[in-house]
């Protein structure tokens, strides 16, 4: 790991007096590759000084899976990422290895602004290298954007229009279209706040969106003069067609359609044999209850879009209690009717929530499967009472 503090800042007035400015600052945008963590791309800053033969990449996306409880901390929004400094050639080699494209946009900064940016990067590296990662609001892309824009003496104006009707969920769907199970996992954990409209700045959490906006932006100085934010754009690492894998055949939709048909067959078998396969109900309650515990934990996550998730009425942690309740009262029709009634009401609420929240693929089918089984059980308790 390189150390940015070893790069001399110099006096910003000297920058203005330098006849040939040897410093270039660029935004690097990396396309996705086949690893799940890379599906949304990546952003970094290149700092190049030909006079001192310095060529480094400032990378706000450094993390380690080996840290204790990494997955649990990530889910709860307690993950710390780190600002790292890499050799430019090493950085490019990594993305070339994965087959990702790297696009470079040279930022049109004045010598004074370059000096301010370097000071900010050095201060960031020395005093705030580790930061609390937030997927939508504080990630490698937003960190790079913010530190660049804060160094600019002027107002940023964007020439391109954006679709303000899109939500965070819409944006990530565009990135994981080939990964149905990754999309399912995201949609399962995100609440209805992820379906709200987004601003331009919010949409810039995705590297491609920031690259697009920077390419269409200009800097307006206090005297009214304007200059493009990006001086020039070039592809410095070419990608290949194998970076992203194809779609999987076994999708969540397929799995839940199969489950619905299986439960329908079990219901028919119960009516024909006049027997109840209580082990099926207990298995469904335990499985949905355990999954519901994850949604319950997400209510306390620091991620801003997970605190209100109506899918918890379908995958409900209370199902664990009702599984035990039904086992204890399996011969008491009145108490069983109470259980099946409550469970059916919860599922109806969950299905109604689909009107205001986008659910994970197949979740309505899962709710219908569970509701079908519960309603048949409810009918049986009334008939036998």
Residue ranges and their predicted role:
Residues 21-99:
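Glycine-rich catalytic cores of cysteine/serine-nucleophile enzymes that process amide/ester linkages
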Residues 17, 36-37, 48, 176-180:
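A general structural signal for short secondary-structure junctions and capping/turn motifs
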Residues 123-325, 331-335, 343-385:
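Activation targets extended, charge/polar-rich intrinsically disordered C-terminal tails
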Residues 64-154:
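A cross-kingdom signal targeting lumenal/periplasmic-facing segments of multi-pass membrane
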Residues 27, 45-47, 58, 105-109, ...:
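Generic structural hydrophobic/aromatic packing signal, biased to beta-strands
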Residues 10-16, 46, 89-94, 172:
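Intrinsically disordered, low-complexity boundary segments flanking structured domains
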Residues 1-16, 383-385:
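Bacterial Sec-dependent N-terminal signal peptides
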């Amino acid at each position: 790991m390189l150390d940015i503090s070893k790069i001399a800042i110099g006096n910003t007035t000297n920058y203005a007096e330098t006849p040939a400015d040897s410093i270039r600052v660029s935004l690097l945008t990396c396309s996705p590759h086949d690893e799940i963590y890379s599906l949304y791309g990546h952003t970094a800053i290149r700092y190049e000084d030909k006079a001192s033969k310095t060529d480094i990449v400032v990378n706000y996306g450094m993390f380690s899976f080996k840290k204790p409880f990494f997955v649990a901390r990530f889910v709860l929004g307690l993950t710390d990422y780190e600002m790292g400094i890499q050799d430019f050639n090493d950085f490019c080699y990594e993305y070339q290895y994965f087959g990702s494209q790297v696009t470079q946009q040279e930022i049109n900064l004045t010598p004074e602004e370059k000096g301010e940016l370097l000071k900010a990067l050095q201060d960031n590296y020395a005093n705030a290298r580790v930061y609390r990662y937030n997927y939508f609001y504080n990630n490698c892309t937003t960190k790079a954007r913010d530190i660049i824009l804060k160094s600019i003496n002027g107002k940023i104006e964007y020439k391109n229009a954006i679709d303000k009707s899109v939500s965070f969920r819409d944006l990530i769907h565009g990135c994981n279209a080939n990964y149905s199970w990754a999309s399912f996992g995201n949609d399962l954990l995100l609440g209805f706040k992820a379906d709200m409209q987004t601003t331009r700045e919010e949409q810039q959490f995705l590297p491609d969106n920031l690259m697009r906006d920077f390419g269409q932006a200009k800097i307006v100085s206090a005297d009214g003069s304007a200059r493009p934010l990006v001086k020039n754009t070039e592809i410095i690492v070419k990608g290949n067609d194998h970076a992203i894998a194809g779609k999987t055949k076994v999708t969540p939709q397929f799995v839940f359609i199969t489950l619905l048909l299986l439960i329908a067959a079990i219901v028919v078998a119960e009516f024909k044999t006049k027997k109840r396969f209580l082990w099926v109900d207990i298995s469904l309650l335990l499985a949905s209850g355990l999954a519901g515990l994850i949604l319950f934990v997400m209510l306390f996550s620091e991620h801003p879009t997970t605190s209100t998730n109506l899918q918890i009425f379908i995958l409900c942690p209370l199902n664990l209690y009702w599984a035990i309740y039904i086992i204890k009262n399996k011969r008491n029709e009145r108490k069983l009717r109470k259980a099946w009634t409550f469970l059916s009401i919860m599922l109806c609420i969950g299905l109604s929530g689909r009107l205001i929240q986008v659910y994970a693929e197949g979740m309505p089918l899962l709710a219908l499967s569970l509701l079908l089984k519960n309603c048949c059980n409810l009918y049986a308790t009334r008939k036998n009472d």
